[in-house]
Amino acid sequence: MSILSERQKDDLNKSIAEYLYAQDLTEIADSLCARLSLDYKSEPNSKYAGLLEKKWVSVIRLQKKLIESENRYTALQEDIAAGPARRRDAQVDWLPTAPARYTLTSHRAPITRVAFHPTFSLLASASEDTTVKIWDWETGSFERTLKGHTREVWGVDFDSKGSFLATCSSDLSIKVWDTQQWDNAGYSGKTLRGHEHTVSTVKFLPGDDLIASASRDKTIRIWEVATTFCIRTITGHEDWVRMTVPSTDGTLLGSCSSDNTARVWDPTSGVMKMEFRGHGHIVEVIAFAPLASYAAIRELAGLKAATKAPGAYIATGSRDKTVKIWDVHSGQELRTVSGHNDWIRGLVFHPSGKHLLSASDDKTIRVWELSTGRCMXVVEAHSHFITCLAWGPPVSAVARVELPRTPFCGDPKPIASRIMEEFNPRP
């Protein structure tokens, strides 16, 4: 008994007949049609033209993915059998090393930002080629391209569930993409407009109902995802706002600017809570310290009073080649660490709370021990400027991006960096 429905059998028979006609095997095709009582005539625009070949290629591709999945499953089973407790400890303290596992190539211009999906093995990359590309970091394969922006894309961020992806661009717009509609032809997401210059960063706030954006128009804006309305404009910076990030509970919003300052705001009122001055050049990047790092920071600064309030400490990186750690509530500079030889473009706290990682245009990633401020390791993994870092979800893969136009993926933990082309002007 055939496992195919009548319609499936008819499609299969016609596809075979079309293939035979295309190979100039007319007599065999006619004989087949007669034997199967098949009423079919080959036509140039027939929907069956090339269908058999496409199905064959799809089967081969699926077989390859199945084999890769089986191999990964076998490797994971062996790793689990080798000692899960020991591996968990190793994962907590893992630090990035060269070389990367994958080189992902497809973008036609410098890559500007990368973001990990919170659940699936997906990596989004934004580029000056006006597109966002989605990759499977586990296999190193390209998934799809998102088109909709008309100029350089500078920021990309997933919400906490991975249901939406936000992007921002020099075309003055922010776009919110429903991940369930990626495959729909012509889909270009919802557009949020209001900024008057390049939008440099976009971030979902905790709860995923609001988005914060930073712009060269010197403002930070808060947007409702559902309505696409701008509900608040925060002003105060005197120059380009390079980045904005929320605290883990969403009660604070940090920003850094070309005016050489970093600031912390109340996102519900737009009131500035603290200003941080001390850098001698543009402040490129800001990051809130996670609760896991508080003990190490207190040891670093000699602080006795303990706090568990989210957003108690921040780190900033500047074109003055230094990283500074600050007490948010007092505004006190706790420590300055130096070692990079060029602009600092990326900062990320290690999930264990023991380290802070920085990326620089000097082509290195440095690992700093938070409790002492000492540089523990220098990763010389790139040949061009490194301009951002992102740490992905637990039990994930490492992704770094090196340009021209190539992201790298490694193992076994998620960290992402991107590098601008050597000849690309530094804004």
UniProtKB/Swiss-Prot annotation:
The record's function comment reads:
Positively regulates the activity of the minus-end directed microtubule motor protein dynein. May enhance dynein-mediated microtubule sliding by targeting dynein to the microtubule plus end. Required for nuclear migration during vegetative growth as well as development. Required for retrograde early endosome (EE) transport from the hyphal tip. Required for localization of dynein to the mitotic spindle poles. Recruits additional proteins to the dynein complex at SPBs.
* Gene Ontology molecular functions: dynein complex binding
> Which InterPro entries does the record cross-reference, listed alphabetically?
Dynein_regulator_LIS1, G-protein_beta_WD-40_rep, LIS1_N, LisH, PAC1-like_LisH-like_dom, WD40/YVTN_repeat-like_dom_sf, WD40_repeat_CS, WD40_repeat_dom_sf
Q: Report the domain remarks.
A: Dimerization mediated by the LisH domain may be required to activate dynein.
> Where do the WD repeats start and stop?
106-147, 149-187, 194-233, 236-275, 278-336, 339-378, 381-420
Keyword Cell cycle found: yes
- State what protein this is by name: Nuclear distribution protein PAC1-2
Which GO biological process entries does UniProt record here? cell division; establishment of mitotic spindle orientation; microtubule sliding
Where in this chain does the entry annotate a coiled-coil region? 58-82
Q: Where in the cell is it found?
A: Cytoplasm, Cytoskeleton; Cytoplasm, Cytoskeleton, Spindle pole
Top-rank lineage group of the source organism: Eukaryota
Q: Which proteins does it associate with, and in what oligomeric form?
A: Self-associates. Interacts with NDL1 and dynein.
